[in-house]
């Protein structure tokens, strides 16, 4: 992958602290390192080197650009018929907001995601990582793969229009459909609008998440924690109707139990301690799955993709 940066470099090189030695030995923000493993980086001046850019476009299979709508066409000129171009922007290539600038924060705000994130009695909050940015990239990859498959059949490239806005709206999933059904979603902390219990509870030594999604899991929870639960709570709809009572009952039970004991008690029920990021990186499953990899002297998060060969041996891809 060839990445073209402005002569002064990608802005995220300075998005710190923290800073650390990068893949080329230059000190850059850790943020930059999280997004640029495995890329060959060159600098280019889009105002004076358009011929070079157009030559490069003619030599590649895929171009990904995130200029303001309309800018790429001025720079790139005529695109070869077999090249796939994926444009990523804030609001897409058309519509009344197409020329507005956007960040992940503003997407989470305008899309309603911040209105449903955070404690019920607190202010709106954003997800702790650039969630919309990440999912937009995943949507771009999916679209590019589909375009490559199509090109194998007809030999033609494609122009793909991916936006943070479309991604944010699609990411509303069940909450968006709750709104379409006439219910106005709101902030619920770690709780779930359609499942109870499904949230983080305060255990003896920290926060602990428990999620019940089936009647069988509910019965297991009642038995494991010896809950004093009325029979009608076996139905999720009844538990939703009496959410505060159900959650209070579970909270009372877990308050005196430490998290490691809860994990042992709740086998078969989705559960987990609320870890810090450092605890997650040190988890035995992270090591077993190769979740951290060293790349050119820098420790990085591994790709989540795992390819198994027919022999069940891990692929080198």
Regions found by a protein language model. Give the residues of each.
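Oxidoreductase and adenylate-handling cofactor-binding alpha/beta cores
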Residues: 137-157, 170-181, 222-229
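Aromatic-enriched alpha-helical interface/lid elements that frame and gate functional surfaces
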Residues: 196-271
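Short Gly/Pro-enriched turn/cap motifs at secondary-structure boundaries
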Residues: 32, 188-193, 198-199, 241, ...
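Conserved PLP cofactor-binding pocket of PLP-dependent enzymes
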Residues: 267-286
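Glycine-rich beta-alpha junction loops
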Residues: 8, 91-92, 164-169, 205, ...
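N-terminal helix-loop segment corresponding to the beta1-alpha1 unit
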Residues: 1-153, 317
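Flexible, small-/acidic-enriched active-site or ligand-binding loops
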Residues: 293-317
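Conserved Rossmann-fold dehydrogenase catalytic segment
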Residues: 93, 121-129, 152-168, 186-193, ...
């Amino acid at each position: 992958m060839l990445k073209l940066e402005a002569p002064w470099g990608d802005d995220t090189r300075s998005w710190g602290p923290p800073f650390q030695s990068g893949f080329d030995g230059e000190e850059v923000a850790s943020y930059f390192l999280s997004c640029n493993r495995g890329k060959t980086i060159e600098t280019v001046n889009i105002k004076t080197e358009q011929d070079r850019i157009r030559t490069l476009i003619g030599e590649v299979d895929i171009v990904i650009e995130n200029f303001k709508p309309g800018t790429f066409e001025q720079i790139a000129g005529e695109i070869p018929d077999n090249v796939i171009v994926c444009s990523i922007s804030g609001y897409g290539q058309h519509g009344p907001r197409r020329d507005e600038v956007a960040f992940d924060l503003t997407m989470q705000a305008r899309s309603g995601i911040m209105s449903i994130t955070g404690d019920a009695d607190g202010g709106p909050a954003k997800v702790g990582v650039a969630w919309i940015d990440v999912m937009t990239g995943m949507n771009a990859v999916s679209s590019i793969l589909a375009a490559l498959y199509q090109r194998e059949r007809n030999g033609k490239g494609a122009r793909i229009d991916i936006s943070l806005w479309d991604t944010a709206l699609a990411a509303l999933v069940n909450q968006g459909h709750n709104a379409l059904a006439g219910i106005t979603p709101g902030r619920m902390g770690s709780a779930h609008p359609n499942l109870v219990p499904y949230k983080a509870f305060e255990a003896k030594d920290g926060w602990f998440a428990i999620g019940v999604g089936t009647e069988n899991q509910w019965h297991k929870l009642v038995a494991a924690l010896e809950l004093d639960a009325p029979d009608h709570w076996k139905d999720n709809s009844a538990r939703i109707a009496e959410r505060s009572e159900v959650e209070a009952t579970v909270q009372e039970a877990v308050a005196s139990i430490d998290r490691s004991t809860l994990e042992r008690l709740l086998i078969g029920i989705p559960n987990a301690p609320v870890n810090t990021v450092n605890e997650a990186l040190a988890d035995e499953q992270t090591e077993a799955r190769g979740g951290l990899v060293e790349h050119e002297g820098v420790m990085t998060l591994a790709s989540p993709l795992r390819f198994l060969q027919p022999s069940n041996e891990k692929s080198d891809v």
